[in-house]
Amino acid sequence: MEITIEMIKELRERTGAGVMEAKKALEEANGDMEKAVTILREKGVIKAAKKAGRVAKEGIIEAYIHTGDKLGVLVEINCETDFVARTDEFRKLAKDIALQIAGMNPQYVSKEDVPPEVIEKEKEIYRTQLRNEGKPEHVIEKIIEGKLEKFYEEVCLLEQPFVRNPEIKVKDLITEAISKLGENIVVRRFARFVVGEE
């Protein structure tokens, strides 16, 4: 199938890819637009993985105050250069993440931030529940792993389904931004405040 300029333009608008990347993806997908998007996303993940090791020491602190002034969020998001930190794309990402924190109330940034004693406590609760349900011992550990993944989705910001598009997780949203902006991006820390809460 012949790849037209219009097809390349459409794919670039949808993905933010360069001209040659878009053309190669369309050729690889035999002109199938959805398949080409998938190919570019996969390549974007590879690019993002390469950038993950780079130091991100620039960035911004985004503040969000919910209507009624009863709930507020501060989040620090870092990138590699102040140029990227000033872009609309980066600021939109920071705002989306602040809204995510306000709405979903995560406790930690990532799985690695969850203290081992919290994980052990959760495992023990699940183990007791499963034994009380009469589950065989040989399947309990497998079930616990599945339950832990659900637990991470509730308490870890990066593992949560993104509120504006639950098809993807917050970490996927950041990976897409890394791919588009060409720099490593890290959610460093956040604080969520609710009036009257300790």
Curated annotation (Swiss-Prot):
Keyword Cytoplasm: yes
GO BP, sorted A to Z: translational elongation
SUPFAM superfamilies: Elongation factor Ts (EF-Ts), dimerisation domain, UBA-like
Superkingdom per UniProt: Bacteria
Key words of the record: Cytoplasm, Elongation factor, Protein biosynthesis
Protein source organism: Dictyoglomus turgidum (strain DSM 6724 / Z-1310)
Location of the protein in the cell: Cytoplasm
Any single Gene Ontology cellular-component annotation: cytoplasm
Protein function: Associates with the EF-Tu.GDP complex and induces the exchange of GDP to GTP. It remains bound to the aminoacyl-tRNA.EF-Tu.GTP complex up to the GTP hydrolysis stage on the ribosome.
Gene3D superfamilies, sorted: 1.10.286.20, DNA helicase RuvA subunit, C-terminal domain (1.10.8.10), Elongation factor Ts, dimerisation domain (3.30.479.20)
Main location: cytoplasm
This protein's record includes keyword RNA-binding: no
Family statement: Belongs to the EF-Ts family.
Protein name per its UniProtKB record: Elongation factor Ts
GO molecular function: translation elongation factor activity
Chain spans, region Involved in Mg(2+) ion dislocation from EF-Tu: 81-84
InterPro entries: EF-Ts_dimer_sf, Transl_elong_EFTs/EF1B, Transl_elong_EFTs/EF1B_dimer, Transl_elong_Ts_CS, UBA-like_sf
CDD domains: UBA_EF-Ts
